[in-house]
């Protein structure tokens, strides 16, 4: 994920945004050479050749050295989940703004600690909820808000991929990663929250590696369902889809299609033209706008990450109990 953020910052600079990558920190010396180590389940736009020039970008095996640099204003935390809160807090105490990868943490208490530190230091700390910025998904939020096709009456989200083979065993240790429930499915839980607010209850079936949840959302008369999972076959292609029914249209997104977003109305089916950028570009450009004063509040605030964490924990409780579980307010 670090290389994905790096490439997005570089594209932002190339497009004229007031930013420049000045430093990289990693405990692995091989990653400080600037050479690519490709991994992941989606094309993030990161290049497969040299990622950065170490003669132009400072490199630090010790993150505290990076945080002590006056040249650094914004830090992307792209590490294992268990380190997110500690590193984000250290960055804010050093006077830096923070973009922290998802999931922010696996507990409500950890997210609350981070919120308090952001309030105390006055620093920006934004969770990297990239789907809020993803072309076709930001469009969906706009249509929901404007009611251009009426209100949403049902929604189904699907996010499936091969089980991660990278990460040195981190992802297969569900006590550390939270499994696909926390690490992959979080995207759709966040988007359900983004569209409908906090669900009152959830009913989850499956396993921590592959699950399906029905969300009780008071504003939606029909079902709101999200399926997410890491599948056993390494050759399985990544799948990211939604079908959302409005009163006067159906929106159908499938990242695997040449035309990912289609809208079906009473009289026609049409393609919706989307931006060539991706959600990583969007979240990073928004973070830059926040730091430079061109935006005044995060589109993905930490308070939302707290609510999403509560929803995911309710899903885990439902999974264990075998019946619907209310979401703590």
Regions found by a protein language model. Give the residues of each.
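N-terminal glycine-/serine-/threonine-rich beta1-alpha1-beta2 phosphate-ribose binding loop
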Residues: 1-94, 120
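Active-site loop of classical SDR/Rossmann-like NAD(P)-dependent oxidoreductases
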Residues: 4, 274-285, 300
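C-terminal helix-rich "cap/oligomerization" subdomain common to oxidoreductases
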Residues: 14, 74-76, 219, 289-329
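Short glycine/proline- and charge-enriched loop/turn segments
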Residues: 15, 95, 168-176, 265-270
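Short loop/edge segments at beta-strand edges and connector loops
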Residues: 61, 100, 108, 127, ...
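Beta-strand-loop-alpha-helix segment that lines the small-molecule cofactor/substrate pocket
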Residues: 73-74, 80-132
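Predominantly a Rossmann-like dinucleotide-binding segment in NAD(P)-dependent oxidoreductases
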Residues: 131-205, 322
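Contiguous beta-strand/loop segments that form the cofactor/metal-binding neighborhood of enzyme cores
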Residues: 183, 189-258, 284-295, 328
């Amino acid at each position: 994920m670090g290389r994905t953020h790096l490439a997005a910052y570089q594209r932002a600079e190339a497009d004229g945004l007031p930013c420049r990558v000045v430093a990289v920190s990693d405990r692995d010396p091989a990653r400080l050479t600037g050479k690519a180590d490709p991994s992941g389940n989606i094309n993030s736009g990161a290049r497969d050749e040299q990622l950065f020039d170490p003669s132009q970008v400072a490199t630090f095996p010790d993150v505290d050295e990076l945080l002590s640099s006056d040249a650094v204003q914004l830090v992307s935390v792209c590490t294992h989940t268990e380190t997110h809160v500690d590193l984000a807090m250290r960055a804010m105490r050093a006077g830096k703004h923070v973009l922290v990868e998802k999931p922010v943490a696996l507990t409500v208490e950890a997210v609350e600690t981070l919120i308090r530190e952001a309030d105390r230091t006055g620093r920006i700390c934004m969770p990297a909820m990239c789907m809020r910025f993803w072309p076709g998904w930001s469009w969906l939020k706009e249509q929901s808000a404007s009611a251009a096709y009426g209100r949403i009456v049902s929604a189904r989200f699907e996010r499936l991929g091969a089980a991660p083979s990278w990460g040195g065993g981190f992802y297969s240790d569900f006590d550390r990663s939270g499994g696909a429930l926390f690490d992959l499915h979080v995207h759709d839980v966040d988007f359900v929250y983004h569209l409908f607010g906090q669900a009152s209850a959830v009913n989850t079936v499956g396993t921590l590696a592959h699950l399906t949840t029905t969300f009780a959302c008071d504003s939606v008369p029909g079902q709101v369902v999200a399926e997410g999972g890491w599948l056993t076959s390494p050759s399985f292609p990544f799948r990211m889809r939604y079908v959302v029914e409005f009163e006067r249209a159906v929106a159908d997104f499938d990242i695997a299609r040449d035309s990912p977003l289609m809208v079906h109305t009473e009289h026609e089916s049409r393609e919706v033209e989307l931006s060539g950028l991706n959600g990583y570009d969007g979240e990073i450009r928004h973070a830059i706008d926040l730091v430079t004063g061109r935006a005044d509040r995060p589109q993905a605030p930490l308070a939302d990450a707290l609510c999403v964490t509560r929803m995911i924990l309710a899903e885990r409780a439902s999974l264990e109990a075998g019946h619907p579980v209310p979401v703590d307010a």
